[in-house]
């Protein structure tokens, strides 16, 4: 993640109801730092999205343990709803598999976000829990996808 990519990501604005994904309070310097767990998704030299790995993928109120690596992400707003999400997420997960070799990936998705839920389920994620966030009271789904040892590279 470069400082320029991080600065661009925090300006992205999604239409309602997806505006809950706007990163209005995020600090570009943190997103660009090595400790943030953020990685840019770049296609032909153009920033198209990002993936995060670690605590950023968790929502306050969810029941999380260390049995899976949390991952979150976003697609540039003008690219959403065009059928690109599945490939973007799959590419990010492949990177995460190579980089971190987790036993499982875990995603937390807003319950209203049927597009994202459909995509992650098509990628092998299975529902394990639902909860209400501590802030705002929105409903979220937690889904997990085990990673077979044979597919891990570390």
List each language-model region with its residue ranges.
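Amphipathic alpha-helical recognition patches that constitute DNA-binding helices
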Residues: 70, 104, 115
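Conserved acetyl-CoA pyrophosphate-binding loop and the N-cap/start of the following alpha-helix
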Residues: 79, 83-91
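Conserved active-site alpha-helix within GNAT-family acetyltransferase domains
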Residues: 86, 111-129
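Conserved GNAT acetyl-CoA-binding A-motif
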Residues: 98-108
